[in-house]
Amino acid sequence: MLWELYVFVFAASVFLNFVGIIANLFIIVIIIKTWVNSRRIASPDRILFSLAITRFLTLGLFLLNSVYIATNTGRSVYFSTFFLLCWKFLDANSLWLVTILNSLYCVKITNFQHPVFLLLKRTISMKTTSLLLACLLISALTTLLYYMLSQISRFPEHIIGRNDTSFDLSDGILTLVASLVLNSLLQFMLNVTFASLLIHSLRRHIQKMQRNRTSFWNPQTEAHMGAMRLMICFLVLYIPYSIATLLYLPSYMRKNLRAQAICMIITAAYPPGHSVLLIITHHKLKAKAKKIFCFYK
C-alpha cells in the first residue's frame, strides 16, 4: 500500500513538472515576443521573465532527476551533490523573485501612506535590475551556506588541532543553520506580509465601490480583483509549500513514507500552480492563452 502511494505521488509529481515546464515556457515565449515587438519591457514583466526562466530550469532539473530515479541509472556522489546544489540555488532564487514580484504588486496597487511603504513605492520600479542581481547573490550565498553545513556535518563533533586543541564544530553548525532559517523566515514573512496587505487594501476598495452606487466596474477594478485572487491563491499554495519544505528535511520524515509523500506532492504543486495563476491573472498572457486554446478547439 505504501509503495503504491509512493508510485502515485511520483507520477503526480512528474505530471505537475510537465505542466509547470509548459506554463513557464509559455510565459518566456510571450514576454520575449512582446519585448521584441515593443523594444521595451516593464518592471513586472522583467521580474516575471526571470522567474519563469528560473522555474523552467528548476522543473527541468527535477524532470531529469525523475528520469534517473525511474530508470534506476547509477550516478556518482558528485553528480548528486551538483544536482542538489543547483536545485538549492534555483529554488532560493525563484522564491526571492516571487518576493520581489509580490512587493511590486503591493506598492503599485495599494495606497498606504507609511514612510517606508512610500519609499518602496518610489524606488522599487527603478531598482529592478539591482534587485534581480541581489536575488542571484543572496541565492548563491544561501547555497554556499548549505554546502558548508553539509560538509561540516560529515566530520566528527570535535576535531583535534595541531596543538592538541579541541575545536567544537557545533557553534559553526548552529550559525549556518540560523543563517538558513533566517533567510527562509525572512522570505516567508515578506511574502505573507505583502500578500496580506494587498488583499486587505483591495477588499477595502471593493467594499467602498459597493457602498458607492455611482461607481462602476472598469478594467482597472477587474485587474485589482485578479490581483486579489492571485494573492489569495498564492497564500493557499505558498504557506503549505513552506511548511512542507521545512518538514521534508529532518531525517525522521524520510523514514515515514506517508509524510514524505504528502510533502512531495505539496512541494511539487506550488511552482506549476503559481505559474498557472500568473498566466490567468496577467491580461496579456491570459489573452494569448485563450487564442491558443480557441485555435486548437
Curated annotation (Swiss-Prot):
Several bitter taste receptors are expressed in a single taste receptor cell. The chain crosses the membrane at residues 12-32, 47-67, 81-101, 129-149, 172-192, 230-250, 261-281. Gustducin-coupled receptor for denatonium and N(6)-propyl-2-thiouracil implicated in the perception of bitter compounds in the oral cavity and the gastrointestinal tract. Signals through PLCB2 and the calcium-regulated cation channel TRPM5. In airway epithelial cells, binding of denatonium increases the intracellular calcium ion concentration and stimulates ciliary beat frequency. Belongs to the G-protein coupled receptor T2R family. Expressed in subsets of taste receptor cells of the tongue and palate epithelium and exclusively in gustducin-positive cells. Expressed in 15% taste bud cells in circumvallate and foliate papillae but only in 2% in fungiform papillae. InterPro entries: TAS2R, TAS2R4. It is found in: Membrane; Cell projection, Cilium membrane. Residues 1-11, 68-80, 150-171, 251-260 are extracellular. Keywords: Cell membrane, Cell projection, Cilium, G-protein coupled receptor, Glycoprotein, Membrane, Receptor, Sensory transduction, Taste, Transducer, Transmembrane, Transmembrane helix. Glycans are attached at residue 163. It comes from Mus musculus (Mouse). GO terms for biological process: detection of chemical stimulus involved in sensory perception of bitter taste; respiratory gaseous exchange by respiratory system. Residues 33-46, 102-128, 193-229, 282-297 are cytoplasmic. This is Taste receptor type 2 member 4. One of its GO terms (cellular component) is ciliary membrane. Its main location: membrane. It is a multi-pass membrane protein. One of its GO terms (molecular function) is bitter taste receptor activity. It holds the Pfam family TAS2R. The keyword Transmembrane helix applies. PANTHER family: TASTE RECEPTOR TYPE 2, TASTE RECEPTOR TYPE 2 MEMBER 4.
